[in-house]
Amino acid sequence: MRTDMRGKDFVTLMDYTGEELQTILDVAFDLKRQNAMGAEHELLKNKTLGMIFAQPSTRTRVSFETGMTQLGGHAQYYSEDNMQRKNKETWEDTGLVLSRYLDALMVRLYDLEKYGMARDIMNEIRKATTIPVINGLDDKEHPCQCMGDLMTLQEKLGTGWKKKKIVMSWAYSDRVKSPGVPQAMLIACSLLGADLTLAYPKGYELDDDYMAFA
């Protein structure tokens, strides 16, 4: 099946089909193999990715910056402290202004005080921008980490990994942020036809919308 995702936001995996997710994985594996063989790419030459980290992350930041560099592009890091957000600029204005300079925008934002608030802000930014918006983790999903996890499953278990029984635990932790990782994995495995069992204790139930979708 031919897929065309040019200019499309990557905020929720619910906006994608299983074929589209598989295409993303196939392209990622191809680029990873070529990079391992020393091939150089300029697929994103003269392209700039803006990265808003309302909450910090070592791995997410390094992954995006390295990926942009390997593909010939450039990534810029922003926190709320070094943007006009600290002077009470709205998220809408922030997104509108940044879209005039950038080619894509990654946003990492979550707030456990009110579930869904981060996704509402993410959607506010999406509506204000004219460029693709990528979810680097909000309070509902972590789609990019999910795709990385799926790559690891295929690397370790082979191309027949979807026929394996996958068990994922979602449990107690000193640094619980959001249910974004298990909810994204739930959607991805459902779309790809994989068998996922999610184990969690009482009080860690997932969003009803995600359970219904899966």
Predicted regions and their residues:
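Phosphate/diphosphate ligand-binding glycine-rich loop within oxidoreductases
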Residues: 42-154
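Generic, ordered loop/turn and secondary-structure boundary motif
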Residues: 6, 11-17, 45, 84, ...
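Long, low-complexity, intrinsically disordered polar/charged segments
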Residues: 29-52, 102-104, 155-172
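Alpha-helical scaffold segments in soluble metabolic enzymes
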Residues: 23-30, 97, 124, 148-155, ...
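Glycine-rich phosphate/diphosphate-binding loop of Rossmann-like nucleotide-binding domains
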Residues: 54-66, 155-214
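Positively charged, low-complexity intrinsically disordered leader regions
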Residues: 1-62, 66, 141
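Residue-level detector of flexible, active-site-proximal loop/helix-junction positions
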Residues: 17, 82, 140, 173, ...
